[in-house]
Regions:
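Long, contiguous binding/interaction regions
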Residues: 1-96
Length: 96
Protein backbone atom coordinates (compact mmCIF):
# COMPACT_ATOMS: atom_id res chain seq x y z
CA UNK A 1 0.00 0.00 0.00
CA UNK A 2 1.08 3.55 -0.58
CA UNK A 3 1.57 5.92 2.30
CA UNK A 4 -1.13 8.55 2.66
CA UNK A 5 -4.05 6.31 1.71
CA UNK A 6 -6.62 5.75 4.45
CA UNK A 7 -7.91 2.26 5.16
CA UNK A 8 -10.35 0.67 7.59
CA UNK A 9 -8.68 -1.27 10.38
CA UNK A 10 -9.90 -3.48 13.19
CA UNK A 11 -8.31 -4.63 16.40
CA UNK A 12 -8.16 -8.40 16.75
CA UNK A 13 -6.54 -11.07 18.86
CA UNK A 14 -5.09 -14.16 17.19
CA UNK A 15 -4.77 -17.12 19.55
CA UNK A 16 -2.24 -19.71 18.41
CA UNK A 17 -1.37 -23.17 19.72
CA UNK A 18 1.86 -24.69 18.42
CA UNK A 19 2.16 -28.47 18.81
CA UNK A 20 4.93 -28.86 16.22
CA UNK A 21 8.22 -27.15 17.23
CA UNK A 22 9.43 -27.33 13.61
CA UNK A 23 6.72 -24.80 12.63
CA UNK A 24 8.05 -22.07 14.94
CA UNK A 25 10.58 -20.62 12.46
CA UNK A 26 7.93 -20.26 9.74
CA UNK A 27 5.44 -18.86 12.27
CA UNK A 28 7.95 -16.24 13.41
CA UNK A 29 8.62 -15.29 9.76
CA UNK A 30 4.88 -14.73 9.20
CA UNK A 31 4.62 -12.62 12.35
CA UNK A 32 7.70 -10.61 11.35
CA UNK A 33 6.06 -9.79 8.00
CA UNK A 34 3.04 -8.40 9.90
CA UNK A 35 5.21 -6.57 12.42
CA UNK A 36 3.99 -3.08 11.43
CA UNK A 37 0.47 -4.03 12.53
CA UNK A 38 1.20 -6.06 15.67
CA UNK A 39 0.38 -4.23 18.91
CA UNK A 40 1.74 -6.89 21.23
CA UNK A 41 2.63 -10.55 21.57
CA UNK A 42 2.55 -12.95 24.50
CA UNK A 43 4.03 -16.43 24.40
CA UNK A 44 3.61 -19.13 27.02
CA UNK A 45 5.62 -22.35 26.76
CA UNK A 46 3.57 -25.14 28.33
CA UNK A 47 6.43 -27.56 28.87
CA UNK A 48 4.36 -30.23 30.63
CA UNK A 49 2.27 -30.66 27.46
CA UNK A 50 5.03 -29.88 24.96
CA UNK A 51 3.11 -27.01 23.35
CA UNK A 52 3.43 -23.24 23.00
CA UNK A 53 0.51 -20.86 23.44
CA UNK A 54 0.83 -17.51 21.68
CA UNK A 55 -1.51 -14.49 21.65
CA UNK A 56 -1.11 -11.72 19.10
CA UNK A 57 -2.89 -8.35 19.40
CA UNK A 58 -3.11 -6.70 15.99
CA UNK A 59 -4.61 -3.54 14.44
CA UNK A 60 -4.85 -4.00 10.67
CA UNK A 61 -7.26 -4.24 7.74
CA UNK A 62 -9.60 -7.20 8.20
CA UNK A 63 -8.41 -8.96 5.03
CA UNK A 64 -4.81 -8.76 6.24
CA UNK A 65 -5.76 -10.23 9.64
CA UNK A 66 -7.77 -13.02 7.99
CA UNK A 67 -4.92 -13.81 5.61
CA UNK A 68 -2.36 -13.95 8.41
CA UNK A 69 -4.58 -16.14 10.58
CA UNK A 70 -5.22 -18.47 7.64
CA UNK A 71 -1.52 -18.79 6.82
CA UNK A 72 -0.75 -19.56 10.48
CA UNK A 73 -3.55 -22.13 10.71
CA UNK A 74 -2.27 -23.96 7.62
CA UNK A 75 1.10 -24.66 9.25
CA UNK A 76 1.46 -28.31 10.23
CA UNK A 77 0.84 -28.78 13.95
CA UNK A 78 -0.41 -25.21 14.46
CA UNK A 79 -3.96 -24.01 15.10
CA UNK A 80 -5.18 -20.41 15.13
CA UNK A 81 -8.44 -18.65 15.98
CA UNK A 82 -9.17 -14.95 15.67
CA UNK A 83 -11.50 -12.70 17.68
CA UNK A 84 -12.32 -9.28 16.22
CA UNK A 85 -13.36 -6.02 17.84
CA UNK A 86 -16.57 -4.57 16.39
CA UNK A 87 -14.97 -1.12 16.17
CA UNK A 88 -13.68 -0.13 12.73
CA UNK A 89 -11.31 2.84 12.51
CA UNK A 90 -9.53 4.74 9.75
CA UNK A 91 -5.75 4.60 9.65
CA UNK A 92 -3.06 5.69 7.24
CA UNK A 93 -1.76 2.79 5.14
CA UNK A 94 1.50 1.19 6.24
CA UNK A 95 4.36 0.61 3.82
CA UNK A 96 4.45 -3.19 3.46
Amino acid sequence: MRKGIEMDTRVAVISIIVENPEAIVTLNDLLHEAGNYIIGRMGIPYREKGINIIRIAIDAPQDMISSLSGKIGRLKGVSAKTAYSNIITKAEAQND
